[in-house]
C-alpha cells in the first residue's frame, strides 16, 4: 500500500480522537521517499510571552517501501507520540526515552499495536524501481599523464557549458 495525504489525514484524525483525546492540532502531513526513515516528526520551538510553543509541526511518512496498512498505522502512531510529547512540553531523556517508551508500550499493550523504535527494512519491497539518472562527467587533461574527473551537478551544466565554449 502506498500512503496518500488524504489517508494520512484520516489516520491522524482517527488516532488523535482514539488515543490522544483529540488534543493534537492537525500538523502538516508530508510524503517522502526516505530510505532510512519510515517517518519523521519535526517542529520549531518559538518563545512567546507565555513561554515556549511549538510551531510548524510536520509529520512525514515515507512512500519508498511498499508498507502494509498496519505498518503505516504503526509509523503514524510512532510520530504522533513524538508530537504529543513536544506539545506537552515534557522533557524526555532522549528522542526515544522513558516518556516515549512508556507511551509506546501503553499503546502496544492496551490496544495491540506493534509500534517500535527501529524497523529492519532489508527484506521489504520498494514501491518502484529506482530511477536511472543521467550524469555529465567532466574529464580534463591537466598535464601529460595527469587527468581530472568529476561529476557535474545538473544545475551547473549550462554555466559550465557556456564557459567551456570560450576555451580555445
Enumerate the predicted regions with their spans.
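Metalloprotease/metallohydrolase-associated module, dominated by Zn2+-dependent proteases
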Residues: 1-70, 87-168
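Active-site recognition of the HExxH zinc-binding catalytic motif
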Residues: 74-87
